[in-house]
Amino acid sequence: MKNVFRTAIICIMIFSACSKRENNVLPEDNGCIERIYLPVTTHSVSSAYVTTINDLFSNNQIANGNLRYYKYSRDIFQTLYSPYTKYDQQIVEVNQYTNGLRIFVRDLSYSFWDQRFHLRSGEVTKGTSLDTLHQLTLPQLRGLFLASAQQFDKAADKFKDVCLKAEFGYYNLNTGISYAPEVLVKAWRITPLNSVYPSEYPVAYYQDNGKLISYDNGIQTSR
């Protein structure tokens, strides 16, 4: 029995050592990088628009507890066919959240005609059973970003002295694949700190194990 116990302890120690070794092979950089967090309630539209959007969702019985509003527009839409009806069109673009974290590149767009729901673009998430804990450190994330920039971006050298920002959330690995099931993984979104939407380039996404999902410099996306 003692031999079995000792064998189990040795196996655990070996597994732990291997895990640490794998984690240590990731590039690290101790330069500037900050972690940011955008709660679902920190909308990027004015408070007046938030009230308007809340009313639209409420009046049309659309659940909005996991939606962060980042764009709102209103205009007159006229159909291209007789009788050429005109509608008061309101469009709301949102980020989706689950477990309090953003799902990257999983946005939705809602269109309302005369305050009534007209159509939705994008797939509604089914959520995830994954927790909100992460493994990667900020120096590792900065190291990964700089390594990706060096590999894919001709302007890589200018980012060596640039401060970065990192956001933890989830990513659907089947993004862009029609009719494919949603496969959410823990992920990080890395961009220059002073970049502002919609010009947050370059932007890189990594799984929480350090595997690159995509690197986009605004001209070309690399995976």
Which residues fall in each region the model found?
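C-terminal motif of bacterial Sec signal peptides marking the signal peptidase cleavage site
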Residues: 14-17
